[in-house]
Amino acid sequence: MSFVVVIPARYASTRLPGKPLADIHGKPMVQHVVEKALQSGADRVIVATDDERVHSALASFAEQAGVEVCMTSQDHQSGTERLAEVCRHYGFSADTIVVNVQGDEPLIPPAIIRQVADNLAAASAPMATLSVPIQDAEEAFNPNAVKVVTDKEGYALYFSRACIPWDRDRFAASDRAAGSHEQIGDHYQRHIGIYAYRAGFIQRYVDWAPSVLEQVEALEQLRVLWYGEKIHVAQALQAPPVGVDTQADLDKVRALLAN
């Protein structure tokens, strides 16, 4: 099964400037992500960046590894818009499966990159993603942990920062479960931010106006459900380790790779 991995690598970052080039044991962070993507069995791996410094830092490695680096606009409002530009630039056919792997996930398991591509190929949906089980009530009530509920076929019904589904019998009396490490039912799933798309759908997606729900929740994927399309969701074969948003995250990743 053929698929392409696109890795958006935007240089500017409020919390960690120059994040794609952050050094992790002698390599820029984005190179670690590229290496994971290459191990997934992707036919092509493309880094989409808005900064010549990223392009230059990867040039030698990319040439040796057969990786492409695509310069994109600095004006995109989202990673999906950057992805759409890449699809137009390379002229991907409408049925091409494109996996969007974030450039700040240097520890992402290659197996789940392949998994989300395979899932999309088998699904009656233009988009697929993954989830992992939520471990306890503290995570379920954490607004930074995005929850997802699906139908019996594995298609998303809704994504939310709120605790969904709401366990009426457990939570109705009070919110005492918030902040608790009490175990929670296995029907609670946390969404993880890896997506596979059919290339023809990406352009439709970015042409749609933002939806009310995505603006309320600050969750871009809700636009897809708002306009009546499906998102396939499966439980990830492996839970991905921490991504990098802050200096503390970067320090954790360096420590993990050192071991």
Curated annotation (Swiss-Prot):
Location(s), subcellular: Cytoplasm
Enzyme type, top EC level: transferase
SUPFAM superfamilies: Nucleotide-diphospho-sugar transferases
Molecular functions per Gene Ontology: 3-deoxy-manno-octulosonate cytidylyltransferase activity
Keywords: Cytoplasm, Lipopolysaccharide biosynthesis, Nucleotidyltransferase, Transferase
GO BP: CMP-keto-3-deoxy-D-manno-octulosonic acid biosynthetic process; lipopolysaccharide biosynthetic process
Source superkingdom: Bacteria
Catalyzed reaction equations: 3-deoxy-alpha-D-manno-oct-2-ulosonate + CTP = CMP-3-deoxy-beta-D-manno-octulosonate + diphosphate
Sequence similarity: Belongs to the KdsB family.
Function, in words: Activates KDO (a required 8-carbon sugar) for incorporation into bacterial lipopolysaccharide in Gram-negative bacteria.
UniProt name for this protein: 3-deoxy-manno-octulosonate cytidylyltransferase
